[in-house]
């Protein structure tokens, strides 16, 4: 299996999913197995393949958590989150699957944070009369003031991806 499609956008998004392996957000075998299920240029098959993979890995995470294997559960939740994000990518803005798929990505990411034991807090950032969701990552659970970096993605990224 080659890690590309004739369609450059499909290839880019496939490589994007594979690149998360560097931080534990994907496994190359899962990415290749998913890509094998995708029909060239077919957005529905893209969504279906990634959504099926995300659901399977989320179930694996749930099983690991039930067995008290928190590290394995957290790793699987992180991969599921990224696979749900990949599943959502090509959906039209008015596609009813978009909201549930995006919610799957966020929910599994939150479960990853819980299982991982990282010092992360979900926050709301005040901006121009509204608030924006965000995450505050701390090096430890002390209240010691430290420099803060605000990272913002583009239109096609998610807060969980950063």
Language-model regions, residue ranges each:
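Long amphipathic alpha-helical segments
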Residues: 16-86
């Amino acid at each position: 299996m080659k890690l590309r499609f004739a369609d450059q956008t499909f290839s880019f998004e496939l490589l994007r999913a594979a690149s998360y392996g560097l931080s534990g957000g994907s496994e190359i075998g899962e990415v290749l197995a998913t890509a094998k299920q995708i029909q060239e240029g077919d957005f529905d098959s893209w969504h279906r393949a990634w959504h099926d993979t995300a659901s399977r890995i989320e179930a694996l995470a749930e099983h690991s958590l039930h067995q008290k294997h928190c590290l394995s559960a957290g790793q699987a939740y992180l991969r599921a989150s990224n696979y749900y994000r990949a599943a959502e990518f090509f959906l039209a803005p008015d596609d009813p699957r978009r909201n549930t798929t995006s919610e799957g990505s966020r929910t599994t990411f939150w479960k990853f944070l819980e299982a991982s034991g990282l010092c992360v807090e979900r926050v709301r950032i005040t901006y121009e009369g509204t608030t924006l969701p965000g995450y505050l990552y701390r090096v430890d659970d002390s209240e010691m003031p430290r420099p803060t970096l605000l990272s913002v993605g583009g239109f096609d990224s998610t807060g969980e991806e950063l």
